[in-house]
From Swiss-Prot:
Keywords: Ribonucleoprotein, Ribosomal protein, RNA-binding, rRNA-binding
Quaternary data: Part of the 50S ribosomal subunit.
The protein's name: Large ribosomal subunit protein uL24
Source domain of life: Bacteria
Xref: Gene3D superfamilies: 2.30.30.30
SMART domains: KOW (SM00739)
Name of encoding gene: rplX
One GO location term (cellular component): ribonucleoprotein complex
Family: Belongs to the universal ribosomal protein uL24 family.
Length: 108
């Protein structure tokens, strides 16, 4: 069974609108539909302590943690801010997401 359909896709640029990383922008690295979450580059950084294994020494690794999809909005480069999207159908029948304010297409 597939998860829910989310309003963001992989490689979209998004703006965090709530939480400790509010107003940060980043690229979507991974979509997790079953958790309603996404991984955003440089947002919600957590520290992971790793134990020494064999010849490797223990260390503290910083990595992105999941953020809920409701806490982000798609970033429109033409409007230069976070925007809502609308779905438009092109002449060839293909559906694309567009900015509500300016009409800029996000799906090329």
């Amino acid at each position: 069974m597939l998860g829910k359909k989310l309003h963001v896709k992989k490689n979209d640029t998004v703006v965090v609108i709530a939480g400790k990383d509010k107003a940060k922008t980043g690229k979507v690295l991974q979509i997790l539909p079953k958790k309603d979450g996404i991984l955003v580059e440089g947002v919600n950084i957590t520290k992971r302590h790793t134990k020494p294994r064999g010849s490797e020494s223990g260390s503290i690794v910083e990595k992105e943690a999941v953020i809920h999809v409701s806490n982000v909005m798609i970033y429109c480069s033409k409007c230069d801010k976070a925007v809502r999207t609308r779905t438009n159908t092109l002449e060839d029948g293909k559906k694309v997401r567009v900015c509500v304010k300016c009409g800029e297409a996000f799906d090329k």
